[in-house]
Amino acid sequence: MARDVLIEIGLEELPARFIDDAELQLYTKTKQWLEENRISSENVISYSTPRRLAVFVKNMAEKQSSIEEDVKGPALKIAKDEDGNWTKAAQGFTKGQGLTTDDIVVREVKGISYIYVTKHIEGRPIQELLPEFKSIIESITFGKNMRWGSETIRYARPIRWLVAMMGNEVIPFEIAHVATNNVTYGHRFLGEEVTIQEPAEYEKTLKDNYVIVKAKDRETLIVEQLSKLEREHGFEIPVDQELLEEVRNLVEFPTAFVGKFEEAYLEIPPEVLITSMKEHQRYFPVHKKGVLQPYFVGVRNGDNYHIETVAKGNEKVLRARLADAEFFYNEDLHQSIDFFQEKLTKVVFQEKLGTYSDKVERMKQIADRISEKLSLESDDRKIIERAAEISKFDLMTSMVNEFTELQGIIGEKYANHFGENSATSQAIKEHYQPKHAKDDLPQTVIGSVVSVADKLDTIAGCIAVGLVPTGSQDPYGLRRQASAILRILHNEKWNLTVEELIDIALDVFQKSNVTIMEKTNEELIEFFRLRAVYLMKDKGLEVDVIHAVTDQKLGNVFVSFEKAKELSDKRNDETFKPIQEALVRVLNLSNKVETNELIREDKLETESEKILYTRYLDIKETYEKQLLHNETKQALATLAQLAAPIHAFFDNNMVMADDLEIRNNRLALIQALTSLILPYADLRKIEWKQQF
């Protein structure tokens, strides 16, 4: 007979950011434990609130499944003596398995005969196994742990109660001097201590005590309440999914309420108000026809009793926040950009890389060199120079000091206020983009250039002085910034290689008297290459194709992506296989070529090598122009024209001919062909055969 099982871990309030992952761990580890222990069940459901993590297993079998297990013994030559009798080794083996020599069978493994027995393993009663569940609870990991009292266990928050039940029976075990029972606790203020009669009653029992244990149910309830408020008040309440998930993990029984603030605060930039509401107070901002309104929606952890009082209390808290923001805003606007720029000279960016003022000066030089490479118009270059020059001034403002997440956004607002060109102001905002993998890219070429210059300065500078990310440690966010640069290069389709960018940055650092460590150039190239590999994998491209186009040289990021896509498509084209094989024949031989000889037409001896050389000359200029203009599809098609002549050449000629001049001439031809193929991709790295 199957029975339901419930495990609940009662805790002091967990940080919201830990809850989803902890619940997932509990669910996954439970499923894994059931599978490993051969325990059947109908379903597994996990729960989480700020004060509890729980898992419910429906219709868990009362006994493990019994199995028949084959056990390998010694080799037959050891198990039997010369007379064919079982030796002590065989007898000891079977006895150890609780069997006799009558149960032995012989099987051959890799040409050697071994003795085997089939052992019946009876399933254990579930009551014997369930106390092992303690190890699952103890194995849950969190972003940060703590100890409490004299306990040795480390956990996100102290464990205050444990529920462990199979049917109406308590499963006995203890963690941190807390013993399991069938008693749980409702809402901290509205609920009470309650005894669970059966695991299946868990959800209802807690709901009756003002706890909604399913996170998704709380989320749905919040969304429904927001929709109701929209209808009642004519509001628009944009639902930020990240904020919604955080709020649902802050409450056990959500009740939404409307608060308001003075309209005068709407004079403050809306980004400041929204940040204050969302990031600091976890409120949902309210709009009408896309315009921010002097209202907000909060979510209470409780019912609607005295909800008006709750709203007023929250209004008071927000009012204090907004009063501070208004003060900072007005104070900042009484200053000037030069005032804030001067402060940058006193703030260290990195000990070996100087102040923020030093960084800005390098950014200007890097941005100007990039602009030159891109042949940008003179007016755009002037805007880029100014944007780079004042890109960091807002870091010194009171507003950004209070709302650090608004750096760039405040820079744009203030730059406009202080009379800067709108393109300059926009670039100040955009140069921080993208801040993360899902963030928007800069919308203008000016913003893109300044963004790349900023991030390139940070990456090259840190690696130049030995601050290379290791493992999960990346305090300067270099990996994220490298990915951001690659995304911008791909999006803008600039005819600019990563190697050229690195050369620009290191040249600027050398002229700025920054001591650069040995092999910095190589480390930077490899650092960017690994980020490109990561991004290409994220786009669903195969690893071997990625390495084929990036291992030689990362080069132009957009072109590398396009080549990888083209080669990935060709993997599924049967007609491309002989083309790939021909090009690889050339590359395989090129490893053995050590010659700087030029091809001599008078030493082309056979018809097939003359045809190959002629075809090489025919396509060379066209192919190189196609690569130069990033025409990857056409370039590969042009390269494919060499396939038939290459096969004929290898089939009809001995490359390593006895005649040294003939040999060197053929090797020179191989080198020339290699110099065409490798700039596209090292096709040797692609495992084509697995596709056909």
Swiss-Prot record:
Pfam families: DALR_1, tRNA_synt_2f. Gene3D superfamilies: Isoleucyl-tRNA Synthetase, Domain 1. It is found in: Cytoplasm. It catalyses: tRNA(Gly) + glycine + ATP = glycyl-tRNA(Gly) + AMP + diphosphate. GO terms for cellular component: cytosol. One of its GO terms (molecular function) is arginine-tRNA ligase activity. It is an enzyme of class 6 (ligase). Its EC number is 6.1.1.14. GO terms for biological process: arginyl-tRNA aminoacylation; glycyl-tRNA aminoacylation. Disulfide bonds: none annotated. PANTHER family: GLYCINE--TRNA LIGASE, CHLOROPLASTIC_MITOCHONDRIAL 2, GLYCYL-TRNA SYNTHETASE. NCBIfam families: glyS. This is Glycine--tRNA ligase beta subunit. It comes from Oceanobacillus iheyensis (strain DSM 14371 / CIP 107618 / JCM 11309 / KCTC 3954 / HTE831). The lineage of its organism: Bacteria, Bacillati, Bacillota, Bacilli, Bacillales. The gene is glyS.
